[in-house]
């Protein structure tokens, strides 16, 4: 075995590998974009994607969602909006937790949803749970699209990645209800919002 040739080849291979691994700012476009976490459709003025593709938008199609245009958000685009922090007592452990994220009304304004208070808003979770409310209720209850729980990003498989939620402790008619009944309008794992003009 020629040790010199072996060592030279190993050194060159090591230099090439360290050069490749040392490039921290290399951008791989195929992996650069964050995945979409939230799709807003219906009566909105702004869109950034085309129609639902029944073959590739499987979860949306299974939940009978249809649209010609929609506005999609990834985690950075939601988490990057102006945040609100709330501290409701949660039904799952009967303890107060800190939740933060943008106001749902701000997110709806960003996509150009109608400003009328009787605009219908459907919030849909990945497990198929869906609730309908109005923009008036969204505003009155100060719904947030929570991205963080106790300072950590909400996880898929937990209560996230996004949770439409309000501080039920600060809403007298909800605070008077049993804990298990306070959050019926708050789907965790929210992934789709349908806006219907009144």
Task: List PLM regions with ranges.
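N-terminal intrinsically disordered, low-complexity segments enriched in P/E/S/T
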Residues: 21-198
